[in-house]
Amino acid sequence: MSAQEPDATAQTAPPELFVLRDQEGPILYAPLGNLIARANEPAVAAALAYAHDPSTLDSMSEDERAVVETLGERGFFKHRAYPRHVVGFRPVQVTLFPTNNCNLRCSYCYAFGGEGGGNGEPLTRMDLEVAQRAIDLIARNARQRMDDGDPVRNFLVSIHGNGEPFCAYDLIREIVWYGQDVAEELGVPAVFNAATNGVLSEEQLDFVIANFHSVNISFDGLPEFQDANRPIAGGRGSFRRVDHTMRRLCEAGMDFGIRTTVTAAMVDRMPEIVAFVAENYPGIEQLHFEPVWECGRCVTSDNVMPRSDVFTQRYLESLEVARERGVRLVFSGARQDMVVDTFCKVSSGSFTVTPTGDVTACYEVSYRSDPRSERFFFGRFDHELGDFVFDQAKLDALSELNVHNIRYCDDCFCRWHCAGDCAAKVLDGIALEEHHGSVRCDISRALTLNQIQRKLDWRPTDG
């Protein structure tokens, strides 16, 4: 099934009713109610007239009235408010960046991993005390929120990085052991996950399999792409090492996903990547495709972002292969099954700690020298106090980074799904009111339309 650029801006109605059009005609879509219906043009005209002014029902024909009443019975005209739940900054999850050192030199790395962010900042690693106090904070919050009746079942420690976190393997072990001790002491389960480039030793693999609940591997899908884009520091290819890691994880039955960064040179082979992954790493949790974003080391390399229309078409072709092979394929901006008001947790106090002890709301903003840190950094670890200090004014400002405040998204049918996209990308150096989207919007709209079309085409099977 091909996707067509939806016409969704001209006809919207007050109760979040959008009219999309594809090659088969109009589609009525109410995202907050997850309601979808194909309709002809007279039905669309009647529905929009009623949505804007219910008194028009009196002057409608019998057929128009029947359409409006049927749609109304199914909830298309119901005014729905997005349920916003504000609990203050009481995180039960933390993402720790153990180090900015890295054993790879990926040609498009947003953080210049292994090179201090590209701004001359030194290679460093997190103090164990910083990690311990972060775990204390989220574990106490989890215990308190569980006692208060909140739907909290555990605390989560994610290992990530502006480098390869397992370059600080001894620190990671101490972090995990400490978290397990705290979990036992407070009676709150601890969950550990990690993002890694997959270049791990046997000892590290044994530890991951024994102690982590899930892992996400950055892997570019085919041996030649992996070796070219993600070489080991010094220039050797990394495919053999990462392939071994993923086969070990498969053998252990461990949940893991693959994140593939797609460049213009790779885009036409996306379906082949899906087939290769399905054949060689059976049972992976998901395969995640993202077009490269031209920042960091990518700016000085030959890698460029694929054209949005080409990425979209190859993604749809890949989706067919994925369905045939039993692979879950995802793109971050296309998630019609989710109703959200923020793309990520940046506006709800995402608690991420950099190697220097700074607290950022965004994985992509991890250095003080990054101009975006003025917006996204909202705290730090104070060694004299032995605890974290947070800037409430910064937290308040971050809480405004949601789709309710993005006028550009008002008339977009994806507004409650992609929710304005990644703030670090689309708000780079500009104010929220200047948000004007990006080429990623074209991809998100086309792929979300495709998800809507698939729901319309779905039929229950016998049995």
Positions of predicted regions on the chain:
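N-terminal [4Fe-4S]-dependent radical SAM core
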Residues: 3-38, 60-95, 148-151
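Accessory C-terminal segments flanking Radical SAM cores
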Residues: 12-45, 330-442
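Short acidic, hydrophobic short linear motifs in intrinsically disordered regions
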Residues: 46, 50-60
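Canonical Radical SAM [4Fe-4S] cluster-binding loop centered on the CxxxCxxC motif
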Residues: 88-89, 93-130
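Conserved, mostly hydrophobic/aromatic
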Residues: 102, 106, 217, 357
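Radical SAM/AdoMet-radical enzyme domain recognition
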Residues: 131-162, 168-292
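Short Fe-S-cluster ligation motifs
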Residues: 133-160, 435-463
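Radical SAM enzyme [4Fe-4S]-AdoMet core and its adjacent flexible, acidic
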Residues: 228-243, 247-347, 352, 356-359, ...
